[in-house]
UniProtKB/Swiss-Prot annotation, chain A:
Pfam families: WD40_CDC20-Fz. Belongs to the WD repeat CDC20/Fizzy family. InterPro entries: Cdc20/Fizzy, WD40/YVTN_repeat-like_dom_sf, WD40_CDC20-Fz, WD40_repeat_CS, WD40_repeat_dom_sf, WD40_rpt. GO terms for biological process: cell division; protein ubiquitination. Component of the anaphase promoting complex/cyclosome (APC/C), a cell cycle-regulated E3 ubiquitin-protein ligase complex that controls progression through mitosis and the G1 phase of the cell cycle. The gene is CDC20-5. This is Cell division cycle 20.5, cofactor of APC complex. The keyword Cell wall biogenesis/degradation does not apply. It is found in: Nucleus. Pathway: Protein modification; protein ubiquitination. WD repeats lie at residues 129-166, 171-210, 214-251, 255-294, 304-346, 348-389, 392-431. One of its GO terms (molecular function) is anaphase-promoting complex binding. GO terms for cellular component: Cul4-RING E3 ubiquitin ligase complex; nucleus.
């Protein structure tokens, strides 16, 4: 005690010591009407008197920036309006200095869309095949959903909710192994177990053609590209059929050594993506000029998946971007630049990826999965953050199809149910106008040159 | 050819068929009970039922 006081006396000229001495004196002579200099923040006072007005003139452009500025001001204790202080508040100062900034979330510019967690409709799908390599569900642009249940193809009109049977295939030819609508939504291709493909006019409900000779085993994948119908078979072959020509086979793509289970044309119709049971994805180039060589080499070959690739989806807002999903032994979603052949990203999902769909209005990707959760997962692209997980199916969700307006997704699983999910939300008005205009087009039944 | 994506799972139809043989119920009558693409209603979906488009 004596040493401390003598030490303080010895350094009386030190400003810090003077500060303490003055503070002690001020405590003894406390007055409500005289400002307490030791309690005042002179730096803040100087700032408030000189630059404070300047800040008021500034206009904050966006809500998120305003929220950020508010949070920053609170963290730096700049929200005070008073300059003079009449009492020394050491506890308040200490707590203010050491307290954590508030954890409130900044105001988001875009409110998150509500995604219903339950399917809005459940339809019975008795006899649907629980086969990973088939493609038994498709939603046409005329708002008719086609589904193959065993030997029979059913059409469900989404506008009216009515169901009707299109065709029951003979036992020797069936069962149905794939279906795919033409771009105008008026004709349906039906792939069969006996390697044939039937073409049906769904306006008059009659068969117009049978394609033969392209494959030696069942046709599990189909993809239309205007008047070209591409078929993928259990024999690993991919055949381009021009349905206007009597001898329809115009091209054969050889590259897969096992069953072709995924087949998708890009929106421009210039590139074809194929996935197979050999764990390989091929990108093929479609040239309109017929060449002398009917067999063509692939553009790219992706071998990074470690299981069968059935899920393929071309990105609608970024040309040349392809999303692929691997089966049980892989469980990954990969993104490819099909111009350069580079793998841009790979995301582990934790289970078999059966199907993939891009949103038409937002940068989102929907995936359907198998064992153990049998869920649909909605991802935000490109961060690949999970936005929603949709449960309800009790078996692997093999098939997904998107409505023409882009809002609703139909999913079918081995639990023999067809579920409709309002997962992508309401479309923008412009998109809706464009969509409705497409259907009312008087020449919709005529093939357009694109 | 290896079927690497095969999962053997008993569907409801298979389970019913198995049950019908045990109980001696006629399979034709059993099949008629299910409506193709018929609406399956449950409690959680009734409130959310809405028209498409």
């Amino acid at each position: 005690m004596m040493n401390t006081s003598s030490h303080l006396k010895a350094q009386a000229s030190c400003p810090l010591v003077e500060h303490f001495l003055r503070r002690k004196l001020s405590k003894e002579n406390f007055d409500r009407f005289i400002p307490n200099r030791s309690a005042m923040d002179f730096d803040f006072a100087n700032y408030a008197l000189t630059q404070g007005r300047k800040r008021n003139v500034d206009e904050v452009t966006s809500a998120s920036r305003k929220a950020y500025m508010t949070q920053l001001a609170e963290a730096m204790n700049q929200n005070r309006t008073r300059i003079l202080a009449f009492r020394n508040k050491p506890k308040a100062l200490l707590s203010s200095n050491h307290s954590d900034p508030p954890h409130q979330q900044p105001i988001s510019v875009k409110p998150r869309r509500y995604i219903p967690q339950n399917s809005e409709r459940v339809l019975d799908a008795p006899g649907i095949a629980d086969d990973f390599y088939l493609n038994l569900l498709d939603w046409g642009s005329s708002n008719v959903l086609a589904i193959a249940l065993g030997d029979t193809v059913y059409l469900w009109d989404a506008s009216s909710g009515s169901t009707y049977k299109l065709v029951t295939i003979d036992e020797e030819e069936g069962p149905v192994t794939s279906i795919n609508w033409t771009q105008d939504g008026l004709d349906l291709a039906i792939g069969l177990d006996n390697s044939e493909v039937q073409l049906w006019d769904c306006v008059s409900n009659r068969q117009v053609r049978t394609l033969r000779g392209g494959h030696e085993s069942r046709v599990g994948s189909l993809a239309w590209n205007n008047h070209i119908l591409t078929t993928g078979g259990m024999d690993g072959k991919i055949v381009n059929n021009d349905v206007r020509i009597r001898s329809s086979i115009v091209e054969t793509y050889l590259g897969h050594t096992e069953e072709v289970c995924g087949l998708k044309w890009s929106e421009s119709g210039k590139k074809l993506a194929s996935g197979g049971n050999d764990n390989v994805v091929h990108i093929w180039d479609h040239r309109s000029v017929a060449s002398s060589n009917p067999t063509r080499q692939w553009l790219h070959r992706f071998e990074e998946h470690t299981a069968a690739v059935r899920a393929l989806a071309w990105c609608p807002f970024q040309a040349s971007l392809l999303a692929t999903g691997g089966g049980v032994g892989d469980g990954k979603i990969k993104f490819w630049n099909t111009h350069t052949g580079a793998c841009l990203n790979s995301v582990e999902t934790g289970s078999q990826v059966c199907s993939l769909l891009w949103s038409k209005s937002e940068r989102e990707l929907l995936s359907s999965h198998g064992f153990t959760q049998n869920q649909l997962t909605l991802w935000k692209y490109p961060s690949m953050v999970k936005m929603a997980e949709l449960n309800g199916h009790t078996s692997r969700v093999l098939f997904m199809a998107q409505s023409p307006d882009g809002c609703t997704v139909a999913s079918a699983a081995g639990d023999e149910t067809l579920r409709l999910w309002n997962v992508f939300g309401e479309p923008p008005k412009t998109t809706k106008k464009a969509a409705s205009k497409k259907y009312t087009d008087p020449f919709a039944h005529v093939n357009h040159i694109r | 050819m290896m079927e690497q994506e095969i999962w053997v799972r008993v569907t409801r139809a298979a389970a019913k068929r198995k049950a019908s043989t045990a109980m001696g119920i006629d399979e034709d009558r059993l099949n008629k009970k299910r409506v193709f693409l018929g609406e399956l209603l449950n409690v959680s979906n009734v409130n959310l039922l809405s028209n498409l488009n």
